A protein has these predicted regions:
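N-terminal core-entry segment
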Residues: 72, 77-85, 94, 100, ...
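An active-site-proximal "capping" alpha-helix that borders the catalytic cofactor pocket
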Residues: 70-73, 115-132
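Active-site-adjacent bridging/hinge elements
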Residues: 43-49, 97-98
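Divalent metal-dependent phosphate-bond-processing catalytic cores, especially two-metal-ion Mg2+/Mn2+ enzymes
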Residues: 1-34, 58-61, 68, 75-87, ...
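His-Asp-centered metal-binding catalytic motifs of divalent-metal-dependent phosphohydrolases/nucleases
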Residues: 90-110, 117, 121, 125, ...
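Acidic/histidine metal-binding catalytic segments
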Residues: 87-90, 133-145
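Short, contiguous, pocket-lining structural segments
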Residues: 39-43, 62-69, 86-92
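Active-site flanking loop/helix segments enriched in acidic
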Residues: 49-66, 75-78, 104-108
Length: 241
């Protein structure tokens, strides 16, 4: 394995506890306005282009728009809060992670297996990306991040893109993190407005709550139960209140 791939594909070890990263603050560096034109999806990469087309077909529009918002939020977070990691991280690897992180929630995939959606989604993403020609290291990095994207906790470590996908998805879903104070302030208002303008949230939280309830009903053992209280405790993003 190439050592350079560790940084490029986001394998760098990070604390699992986001609170240990941010301390008592919602950010390390004060967020600044960032245009989405500065953090475009790298569709010049043929693997990203194929995955984008696949995601548009496989996912409901609500989930696809969520995945795109997560991409932009994560790019803003990595550039402004973790510039060292951002300088090495492949935007393509990050884009693939975002586009596929909820692939396990599609109507077909949710009922295709008894496995929890995040775990099956990681396996599915690995298969899809191998088929699209991703390197084994890139495909595995994406798969691990997807498998652990609901594994929010305070013990141990996680990959960099694993932590990043947690931060970006939690920000879009509820805007409140169980271990980070005032988490809704992590993204500049202007950046958030541009992202939401390009990929409107609509009734995303209501829609995804329905997906969660369906998985709980058919898979009472599912990993989603670990995060469900976080979702239900915040029905609206702080910025929308």
């Amino acid at each position: 394995m190439c050592q350079n791939e560790v940084e490029v594909n986001g394998w760098t070890s990070m604390p699992a506890n986001a609170g240990a990263i941010f301390g008592d603050n919602p950010f390390i560096n004060v967020p600044e306005a960032l245009s989405i034109d500065e953090i475009k999806l790298p569709i010049d990469d043929p693997i990203v282009e194929k995955t984008l087309s696949y995601a548009k077909t496989a996912l409901p529009v609500e989930t696809f728009n969520h995945s795109m918002r997560v991409y932009y939020y994560g790019m803003a977070i990595t550039k402004q809060q973790f510039p060292k990691q951002a300088s090495a991280l492949s935007p393509s690897t990050w884009a693939l992670t975002c586009l596929l992180h909820d692939i396990g929630t599609s109507e077909h995939n949710l009922t295709a297996t008894r496995m929890s959606f995040d775990i099956y989604g990681g396996i599915k993403a690995l298969d899809v990306l191998n088929g699209f020609g991703a390197t084994p290291d890139q495909a595995e990095a994406v798969a691990e991040a997807i498998i652990r994207h609901q594994d929010v906790g305070v013990h141990g470590t996680i990959t960099y893109i694993g932590q990043l996908i947690q931060l970006a998805t939690i920000y879009d879903n509820v805007g409140a993190h169980p271990y980070v104070n005032d988490f809704g302030n992590l993204i500049h208002d202007t950046t958030r407005a541009q992202v939401q303008g390009a990929h409107p949230p609509g009734e995303w939280r209501t829609f995804f709550s329905g997906v969660i309830q369906k998985e709980e009903a058919i898979k009472p053992w599912c990993h989603t139960k670990k995060m469900v209280n976080v979702m239900r405790n915040r029905s609206r993003h702080p910025a929308e209140q």
